């Protein structure tokens, strides 16, 4: 019996300002900062790729997340896979998922992908300058699993 593949969209939650990014990269930094400053590197290289339908959206806005889910369904996407950050109990860029958990919408399937690496200044060609370090311990693993269980017990995850 063949199972039908379900397309899942990777969802980077870096599209709203945070105090950490303000400190590390400058006031108001989001991933849009990098998108807008992209430049062509060779003939025929189209840059920057500016956003279309939703513009330079802000993931703090619930209507944006609702529209993204609607667009995803229209284009045959079956779920979102949100990048999830956990640094010894510190979560960052968690607001979109937390607001979805609280509000129960958009009513669209999702999963989490643990972005399990140090945050560094690699963009600035300083990969050894660690901003947030990944450390591992049994105690922290248990806390992380407990948090994840609260997410996985929802109907749409």
Language model segments and positions:
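Glycan-processing catalytic domains of CAZymes
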Residues: 1-157
């Amino acid at each position: 019996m063949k199972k039908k593949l379900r397309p899942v969209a990777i969802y980077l939650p870096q599209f709203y300002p945070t105090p950490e990014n303000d400190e590390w990269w400058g006031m108001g930094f989001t991933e849009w900062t990098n998108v807008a400053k992209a430049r062509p590197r060779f003939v025929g290289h189209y840059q920057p790729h500016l956003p279309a339908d939703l513009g330079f959206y802000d993931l703090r806005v619930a209507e944006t997340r609702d529209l993204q889910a609607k667009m995803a369904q229209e284009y045959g996407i079956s779920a979102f896979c949100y990048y999830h950050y956990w640094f010894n109990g510190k979560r960052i860029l968690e607001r979109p998922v937390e607001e979805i958990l609280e509000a129960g919408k958009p009513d669209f399937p999702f999963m989490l992908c643990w972005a399990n690496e140090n945050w560094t200044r690699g963009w600035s060609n300083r990969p050894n300058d660690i901003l947030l370090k990944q450390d591992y311990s049994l105690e922290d693993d248990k806390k992380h699993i407990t948090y994840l269980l609260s997410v996985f017990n929802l109907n749409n995850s």
